[in-house]
């Protein structure tokens, strides 16, 4: 028996498994905001163009996180249709002169393609209401030239017919600067989501924000160097209209960009999905639905 015990093989010692490495510390809100915006560039609803349209002034100063811009085509009232046509012509020529920076986009597919190519997508519009000359034919001409939004600021019989024509041909209805009653009346007619490219939610009562939410409209809010104040405005839009209605107009502090605002919203509990919507997905969805309605619309053209 002693011999059997002596012949027993020695016990095998198992190798020590190294401890799992400590997970990296979570990113703070600023780092998370920066990473999100790097992957999801902002679509800005309102880009002011220099009055001279000198090539040296373009492309317009923008935040580093901007991936697409709607270029305002507003002109002085006395310039009317002719002034707007000249502006469209000049803008198209200047975008063509900046191929490394800009690319005109006429559809949401072209918008996405421009961004994927590292260019800022430039969308023409909105055109000012006074530049229509009270004519549906002018609407159609602007659309043929690439304009994709018109700013409706009052509501009368022509406005009702114009909204229907805009739905038919695929022009977004921009309600920036319209009083609450005009917004209500326009929303009762349009079948496509409205845009407010220079939204002032503080000027709109809760019931109007609710109607905008039902419409799927996008309120594009100006970003300033006070992210907490802007976040307060966006929190109200989120609460009354829904997170699907929040968007960005432009920033008055392009050097700071959008990271401070998005970091503040993360601290307030906004989800990554909601912030992607704010950055660009909500605006893209509204434009895409406007395009789709135009393709499926069977409304007869409005009288000129």
Positions of predicted regions on the chain:
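N-terminal hydrophobic targeting/anchoring segments and the immediately downstream early-domain regions
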Residues: 2-158, 183-185, 189, 202-304
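Loop-centered beta-sheet repeat module
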Residues: 156-197
């Amino acid at each position: 028996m002693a011999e059997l015990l002596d012949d027993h093989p020695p016990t095998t010692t198992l190798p020590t498994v190294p401890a799992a490495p400590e997970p990296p510390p979570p990113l703070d809100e600023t780092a998370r905001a920066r990473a999100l915006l790097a992957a999801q560039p902002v679509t800005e609803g309102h880009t002011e163009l220099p009055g001279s349209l000198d090539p040296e002034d373009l492309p317009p100063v923008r935040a580093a996180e901007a991936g697409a811009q709607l270029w305002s085509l507003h002109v002085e009232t006395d310039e009317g249709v002719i002034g707007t046509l000249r502006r469209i012509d000049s803008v198209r020529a200047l975008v063509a002169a900046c191929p490394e920076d800009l690319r005109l986009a006429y559809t949401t597919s072209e918008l996405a393609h421009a961004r994927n190519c590292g260019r800022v997508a430039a969308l023409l519009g909105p055109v000012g209401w006074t530049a229509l000359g009270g004519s549906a034919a002018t609407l159609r001409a602007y659309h043929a030239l690439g304009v994709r939004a018109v700013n409706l600021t009052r509501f009368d019989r022509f406005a009702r017919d114009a909204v229907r024509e805009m739905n038919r041909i695929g022009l977004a209805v921009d309600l920036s600067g319209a009083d609450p009653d005009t917004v209500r009346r326009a929303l009762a007619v349009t079948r496509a989501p409205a845009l407010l490219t220079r939204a002032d939610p503080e000027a709109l009562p809760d019931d109007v924000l609710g109607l905008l939410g039902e419409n799927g409209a996008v309120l594009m809010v100006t970003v300033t160097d006070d992210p907490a104040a802007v976040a307060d405005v966006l929190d109200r839009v989120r609460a009354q209209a829904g997170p699907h209605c929040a968007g960005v107009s432009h920033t008055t502090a392009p050097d700071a960009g959008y990271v401070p605002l998005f970091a503040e919203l993360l601290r307030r509990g906004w989800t990554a999905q909601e912030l992607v919507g704010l950055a660009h997905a909500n605006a893209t969805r509204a434009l895409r639905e406007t395009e789709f309605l135009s393709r499926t619309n069977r409304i007869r053209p409005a009288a000129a």
